[in-house]
Amino acid sequence: MKLSIKYIVIIVFSLILSFSFEKHSYAIYDPTSKPNNIVGIHILFPSELSEAARLVNSANGDWGYVTIPIQASDKNLIKWQAFMDDARINHLIPILRLATDGDYFSKISWSKPTDGDVLDFANFLNSLNWPTKNRYVVIYNEPNRGDEWGGVPNPAEYAEILSYASDVFKERSDEFFIISAGLDNASINIPGQSVNEYSFMREMDNAVPGIFGKIHGLASHSYPNPGFSQPPSLYGYQGTASFKHEQDLVQNLEGKQLPIFIIETGWTDTKISESVQSAYYKYAFTSVWNDKNIIAVTPFLLRAGMGPFAQFSFIKDGLQKQDKYKTLQALQKNKGEPELNEYPLSKTNPTEKDFPLDKFTKNIEQNYTATVSKATKILMKWLLNI
């Protein structure tokens, strides 16, 4: 009789323990099913959120998008929870792009990510409160370029990383919306240096059959190439409509139409005047990027400062708003209605003690984290003493 009671307690305890781990039963929703403001902007720093909101939520718009990279060495809970809180306050939908370590402004080659890097990101990003139900995560950047993939591009390696990312993020929460990396649409096949994006995508599917069926969205770098200078009326494989060719290829490979996130695009002011750029942006948003399957367009870049990205910057010399900024701000927008998460905002000046988790390991075997009380430990010892 005593043994039977113990077995009953074990069953009850097991059920209780199964709920002691952090789990998420929610799932992503189809962003095309909701009113949506596709207008966004690419930023580099969380401090730019309020300025971004003034740009993308203007002219009747609401809940526009921001794309921002997060580097492997930048997993600061206080910083990134404040970012999520500020995005919620400013009605911005965040798109986080995973990045390895390097320098945005001066780099020879970004390091190649590992499974451990991906797991680390999954643990960290799952610890944050996100403003929207869909947690948009882009898995790295332009892997068809060698300087973005440890020196030599490798579609098979990227496909494996993308597949693993889909698995490990979804194990932690069904709210993660996994988006493949935007590819360089100007790259040509140069052994050891770069791979044409369409060849790269085919080789990805050859290496991991069905890889595009494991993800939820397709990132596109629909730059007006060659030379960041072509008019948007050209619908070539390298232009502002390259997203369409990428989407069609996935449709042919997988029989699936993926939502499109144009997270980088833009014209260079070294070749195209501000007035012409303004006309190009207006045409592109109204006649090219008005595809019903496009979820967001976040041109590169809000504020670049000095350096190679200055040619794309919407704000120059600190505060000088370019003509393209004013054009995008004046563009009539929709009021987005994303599904939102409700959670208490963090303190104005939080400390590490305000967060439940502040360390993230790269142990591939680590899948769950649980806190077990002293009383629970005693009960476990008693139960095991049969």
Q: What do the predicted segments below correspond to?
A:
Residues 9-20:
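Bacterial N-terminal signal peptides
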Residues 26-156, 183-186, 310-311, 373-382:
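N-terminal substrate-binding region of glycoside hydrolase catalytic domains
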Residues 78-81, 85, 90-102, 111-126, ...:
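Noncatalytic carbohydrate-binding groove/subsite architecture in carbohydrate-active enzymes
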Residues 58-60, 130-131, 209-212, 254, ...:
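Alpha-helix termination/capping residues and helix-transition junctions
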Residues 29-31, 40-44, 50-57, 78, ...:
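Aromatic-rich peripheral "rim/lid" segments of glycoside hydrolase catalytic domains that contact
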Residues 1-9:
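Bacterial N-terminal signal peptides that target proteins for export
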